[in-house]
Amino acid sequence: MSRKCELTGVGVLYGNNVSHSQRKTRRRFEPNLRSIKFRSDITDEVYRLSVNARCIRSVEKAGGFDAYILKANDDILSSAARAIKQKIIHIKAAKSL
């Protein structure tokens, strides 16, 4: 499993630990990933995605999982999230006809 958020694309960053004497040693900054179940109102299904804590707040602020994923850019979504987005778009278009 990669250390990357499936909805925002946030991944591992690299930097330095800096001591009081200014010695620098390399370190990794890993995202705060959580495996969360999101419920889609349009598809009426539950999806389990690995997302960071900030993304959870962003989904709530956007008005739910469906609103967030429809608004999200396809370039940063994982392949699983893109498939979910296409499914939501397809069902939404079928309901509007």
Swiss-Prot record:
Report any Pfam family annotated for this entry.
Ribosomal_L28
Keywords, ordered alphabetically: Ribonucleoprotein, Ribosomal protein
Single GO MF descriptor: structural constituent of ribosome
What GO cellular-component annotations does this UniProt entry give? Answer: ribonucleoprotein complex; ribosome
Task: Offer one example of a GO biological process linked to this entry.
Answer: translation
Domain of life of the organism encoding this protein: Bacteria
Query: Acyltransferase among the record's keywords?
Result: no
Q: Which HAMAP family match?
A: Ribosomal_bL28 (MF_00373)
Family per similarity comment: Belongs to the bacterial ribosomal protein bL28 family.
Q: What is this protein called?
A: Large ribosomal subunit protein bL28
What organism is this sequence from? Rickettsia prowazekii (strain Madrid E)
